[in-house]
Amino acid sequence: MASRWPLRLTACFALFLASAVLRAGGSEDPPLGRQTVEAGVQTLPGATTDRAVLDRYCVTCHNSRTRTGGLALDTVDVTRVAPDAETWEKVVRKIRGRMMPPPGLPRPDEATYDALALHLEGALDRAAAARPNPGRTETFRRLTRVEYQNAVRDILALDVDVSSLLPKDDASHGFDNVSNGELSPTLLERYLAAAQKVSRAAVGSALPSPASHVVVLPSDLTQEDHLEGLPFGTHGGVVFPYTFPQHAVYEIQVRLARDRNENVEGLTEPQQVEISIDGSLVQTLLVKPNRNQSGAYYADEAVDKHLKVRIGVGAGPHDVAVTFPRKTFALEETERQPSLARFNMDRHPRVQLAVYSVSITGPFETSEANETPSRQRLFVCRPSRSTAAAEAACAKRIVSTLARRAFRRPVADADIEAPLRFYREARATGDFDAGIEMAVRAVLASTEFLFRIEREPKNVATHTPYRVSDEELASRLSFFLWSSVPDDELLDLASAGRLSQPATLERQVRRMLADKKSEALVTTFASQWLYLRNLAATSPDARQFPDFDDNLRQAFRRETELFFESIVKEDRSALDLLRANYTFVNERLAKHYGIPNVYGSRFRRVELGEDSVRGGLLGHGSILTVTSYANRTSPVLRGKWILENLVGTPPPPPPANVPLLQETDAQGRVLSMRERMVQHRSRAECASCHRLMDPAGLSMENFDAIGRWRTRTESGSAVDASGGLPDGSEFTGASGLRTALLRRPELFVGTLTEKLMTYGLGRGLEYSDAPSVRAIVHGAQTQDYRFSSLVLGIVRSDPFQMRMSQ
């Protein structure tokens, strides 16, 4: 079985034993080429030089007797790297990251480091070119929930939420599209249920009974201000997209937010509630306080039961909105703490109405199906006559067109035989549309749709690299850049055998990156790489951080999404992810960051001053929050995130039963975070990893657990933000970390390339992929590492265009 790459070496890999014959201390040795003849080292880089470097700095621990970290470098032949390519790739990674020898022991100088790495990389790259190994993706890869939903959107012009129908995807290698082809009976039932829902919505068939869809707002969502997408002169509420399954009457009902005693908050006088669809006002409703009660709260369960309206709505996607008109006079506000609702109740009550939930129930009083976008997309023809032959011909055309898009390849009669059989059976007891609905259901339940299938060509030898077909290349492209199926243009080029032509391929990649569907790179790739998905489950302690609410949580995520999107859409340098002098904020986030003159809930791009701490990802509240604990910062989590996602040298997993950090010393004095980390590193089982992680994480200590700038820690002591990286560089603060990362840009760009490649291939990288990664980074360097140069490099690479036979 192929090994995972980059391999997570054990903690001992980077440790040199205290009894090593190397000199003690952290001095940097002169280049080996300038040393005495007795050292036996040649001036020019080569195998003899490499052997001498390894013997001097590595073999003392990494030998066949001690095998520190499971690695022996005394027996490998430095003149023949191909037989031990996996071992040498480990060595190169450690050398490039300056992770060995570890800090505190003699190290080569920069010239020797680079010479050794360049020579080994050159030999490894030549060996890889002589015997290409593009790796092997799984033959069957099941679509993720996001891919399924996007595919339905693009095939049928239908937005259907399938999150409640399909199970959550497990992640591997950091991404949920790295999956296998398992399909249990339970999972098959879920897919059949999803196919039934989608096919019914696509055709516009009547539902067996009215159904309800409920949108519940987070309890810590502040609704005192105007929200983007709602009419001016209103405050609070919600606007959300909803696909109405049929042309019919629906009931929209609003429930207001309450406190723990079920009293409606902010209801001290009659107030209005507006319900609108697609920006058009449907109805204004009046809610009044209970006359039989006095005071600010009214324990009347029925006070908002009348807040509902029935309205005819056309099938298809619409925006539903509920909000509150502002009074003509200003309400007196209190400084309500926007934390979890249970801490706001009674102590800091809302002074204005707020929406708790909006439910949509229906359809009622259905009418004839109208031409929705999904029907227009699906019904590429209508029977010319009401005869069996005319209907059969049209049905075949509809199913063939649908199957080509769903199966991502040309289809033959055998491919559509089963869907057409379902059509005929349903048509025998229903109308033409009923038959088409069953055919759609059969297509969506087919393994050809649910799985990305890559078949080996006939007569290909075992363990032999081969080029994937143009149809498979189209699918790789579309799922990489769009998280969806190929469009007709891609399929047409693939069918003609032209997609793999270099000029055509580049044009298509640039077209796809410019398409709105490339936002999937933000919502699926970046959100997993940068841990944005973890924000939803992040709840900072409400007592320590009363200013944190769902508005801020959403703003954190949106800032980073818009920022990454700007890198993609504007084709900026990948280094701008670290060094950009701009970000995206709304009023809520701007106040949190201390950025003046930003008003309203709309996000806008703002330029940052040279001394701003918010430039690049390192200043984003999203990342600073998900790498913290609920009540304090975590240099460990932040350091691990930096090493894994920016530097590309992830530490090994922690040992079991790691003891908690002690917050006080023996005398009861509260320890600073740095003192706690020193204590942690004093443990032998912890030291090897924490020596690498902690210094990087400690450099971010000027940001608290919700990303605010600070000069004092939770315990009141002055922040010490001095830190370092495994390469021995030392600096202070996030700006120093940024400078250190930019000093050797190939490390960060290489890490981003590995992440993109893992996501694009849908498999974990192996040691054999390293030459391709190096080639991509080297090629992108001439273009200042523009994002498109990385994507094009990946798409042109052997791992993306080829596959190893079984």
Which residues does each predicted region cover?
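Positively charged n-region of N-terminal signal peptides that target proteins for export
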Residues: M1-R8
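Bacterial N-terminal signal peptides
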Residues: T10-A20
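Short, aromatic/basic-rich helix-turn unit that serves as a nucleic-acid recognition element
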Residues: D74
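Low-complexity, glycine/serine/threonine/alanine-rich intrinsically disordered linker
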Residues: A2, V21-L71, P83-K90, K94-M99, ...
